[in-house]
C-alpha cells in the first residue's frame, strides 16, 4: 500500500517529515488480534470494532492497514513503549508484542510495563516514566546531532 502523506501544497515542502523517534503510550498496534485471547467487549462490539465502526470479519483489510505491526521495518526510528499491566482498554500484550517485533526487526526500542498501570492515569504518567521518555528522546536527538 502506497500512501502519500507528504503533500504537495504549502510553504513547508522543504521540511522533512521524517520521524526521528516515537513514544507509544498504551497504543493498539495489532487490530486483528487486539484481545490476545481474552474476550473484551463494548456491548456487541470489541473496542477495535467501535474504533473502526466495523467488524474484522467484514473488513479485514481495514484492520490490517491500521495495524502498526504490519509496517515494522529495520529502518524504523527508535521507539519507547509504555503499557500498563492493568490496561482494560488496550491489553498490555499489544505493547509487549510491539516491543518483541521491533527488537526482532533490529529497531532500537525500550519498554516499560508498570504493574499497576492502566490506560493512562497516575500510575502511568509517573515522574519516573516521564523522565525515561525524556531521557530516551534526548539520547536519540543527541545521537542524531552527533553529540554522543
Model-found features: residue ranges?
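Primarily recognizes the serine-hydrolase "nucleophile elbow" in alpha/beta-hydrolase
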Residues: 1-38
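Mobile cap/lid helix-loop segments that gate and shape the active-site cleft of serine hydrolases
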Residues: 2-4, 33-71, 77, 104
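Surface-exposed acidic, glycine-flexible loop patches that form ligand/cofactor-binding
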Residues: 12-15, 70-73, 143
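Hydrophobic pocket-lining residues within nucleotide cofactor-binding pockets
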Residues: 29-31, 68, 117
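Acidic catalytic loop of the alpha/beta-hydrolase fold
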Residues: 30-31, 86-90
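Short beta-strand/loop motif that positions the catalytic acidic residue
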Residues: 75, 80-83, 87
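C-terminal catalytic histidine-bearing segment of alpha/beta-hydrolase fold enzymes
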Residues: 82, 89-148
Amino acid at each position: 500500500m502506497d500512501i502519500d502523506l507528504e503533500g504537495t501544497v504549502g510553504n513547508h515542502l522543504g521540511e522533512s517529515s521524517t520521524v526521528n523517534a516515537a513514544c507509544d503510550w498504551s497504543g493498539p498496534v495489532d487490530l486483528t488480534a487486539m484481545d490476545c485471547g481474552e474476550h473484551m467487549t463494548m456491548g456487541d462490539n470489541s473496542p477495535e470494532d467501535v474504533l473502526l465502526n466495523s467488524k474484522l470479519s467484514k473488513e479485514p483489510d481495514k484492520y490490517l492497514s491500521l495495524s502498526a505491526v504490519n509496517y515494522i521495518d529495520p529502518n524504523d526510528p527508535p521507539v519507547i513503549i509504555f503499557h500498563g499491566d492493568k490496561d482494560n482498554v488496550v491489553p498490555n500484550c499489544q505493547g509487549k508484542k510491539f516491543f518483541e517485533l521491533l527488537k526482532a526487526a533490529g529497531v532500537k526500542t525500550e519498554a516499560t510495563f508498570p504493574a499497576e498501570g492502566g490506560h493512562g492515569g497516575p500510575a502511568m504518567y509517573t515522574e519516573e516514566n516521564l523522565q525515561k521518555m525524556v531521557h530516551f528522546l534526548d539520547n536519540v536527538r543527541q545521537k542524531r546531532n552527533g553529540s554522543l
